[in-house]
Amino acid sequence: MFPAAQIRLERPFPNNAGGRNYIDIVVELNGEVFPIELKYKTKKATITDFSGESISLQNHSATDFGCYDYLKDIYRLEKLKNIANHKRGFAIMLTNDPAYHNNTQRVSAYDGFKIYEGATRGGLLNWGLTTKGLQFVCNGRGSFSLSGTYKMQWNTYNNTFRYLINEI
């Protein structure tokens, strides 16, 4: 489709702290750079692929961290956009776990990070209170602010999986 495209996996980019971040996939085409971050989260299931092979999927669980990590990818792509030569990037999630795209409306400490169908995320994102009314603290997963606003619009991949793509 794009034979002139250069594709690199796990490409390092400098970050604002003087270190490096690694981007899952980077496509370079006609002088433009398109960074892509991927998340693949599964719920335990046995599925049959297009060739008839049976595949056992593991349960990743920790939906709260999966949502956080997806939005943190968007944050990282926003920051990268400010320091690198690219006009747009993409955050992509593929999952068979409806906990990501269904809004249960059950109050939880990760309400600010939920990525259910129709949710809009932007600005300051932080953890809320636990069911005991205490501030949730997660080492290594702190608050952050998104510059843009992103609508979560899930799409059907097949009868098992759905995917989410946000352009940054």
Residue ranges and their predicted role:
Residues 98-168:
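Non-catalytic C-terminal interaction segments of nucleic acid-processing enzymes
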Residues 14, 41-43, 96-99:
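Short, solvent-exposed loop/turn segments at secondary-structure junctions
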Residues 2, 29, 81-85:
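A structural signal for short coil/turn segments at secondary-structure junctions
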Residues 25-27, 32-57, 77:
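Conserved catalytic cores of phosphodiester-cleaving nucleases, focusing on short active-site segments
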Residues 1-28:
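A short acidic/basic microdomain associated with nuclease active sites
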Residues 67-79:
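A Trp-anchored, charged/polar loop motif used as the substrate-binding/catalytic surface
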Residues 55-68:
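Surface-exposed cleft-lining segments at the edges of enzyme active sites
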Residues 78-109:
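Nucleic-acid nuclease catalytic cores
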